Regions:
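Conserved beta-alpha-beta core of the PfkB/ribokinase-like small-molecule kinase fold
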Residues: 1-45
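Conserved phosphate-binding/catalytic region of the ribokinase-like
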Residues: 37-152
Length: 152
């Protein structure tokens, strides 16, 4: 009974967060644990779309999927030799936020954001996540950050 109670409480918290979300992002493992499903399209249609139009799923070396009301697109991960994946998700999220700011995407722009702009934003997330996976640190270095920002 205690497990069911905990699962119910977690489910209620997830729904509350979905109601406030403008972008939902998680890994395939996250959604397997939450919903018992790893198919991103199925998770989007059955659990996310009603609450939020923009859904990003990360799949490690198998890339990133973006689902919106208007389109679905897959982005391949860069080929790297990972040392550790600790921090990859947090750095991906940081890269997404950086990309939104870099490309001057505002809240009002999200519903009509085109595939090319999404691609640039997601590339920022993948760049930061890929960088952190190539070290034993769970964050990007100051040197990488400075170089990355100067390339913009």
């Amino acid at each position: 009974f205690e497990i069911m109670k905990t699962h119910t409480l977690i489910g209620a918290s997830v729904l509350e967060n979905l109601e406030f979300a403008d972008i939902v992002r998680g890994s395939d493992e996250d959604f397997q644990n939450l919903y018992g499903k790893s198919d991103a399209q199925e998770v989007y249609k059955e659990h996310i779309q009603f609450y939020c139009d923009r859904f990003l799923t990360t799949h490690g070396a198998n890339g990133v999927n973006l689902h919106t009301r208007n389109f679905t697109r897959h982005f391949d991960s860069p080929q790297i030799q990972p040392l550790s994946t600790i921090g990859a998700g947090d750095n991906f999220n940081a890269g997404i936020i950086y990309g939104l700011l870099k490309y001057d995407v505002r809240h009002a722009d999200l519903p009509s954001l085109d595939q090319d702009t999404w691609g640039k934003i997601i590339r920022c997330g993948m760049d930061l996540a890929s960088e952190v996976c190539q070290s034993y640190d769970n964050y990007i270095s100051k040197e990488f950050a400075a170089k990355y920002v100067s390339q913009s």
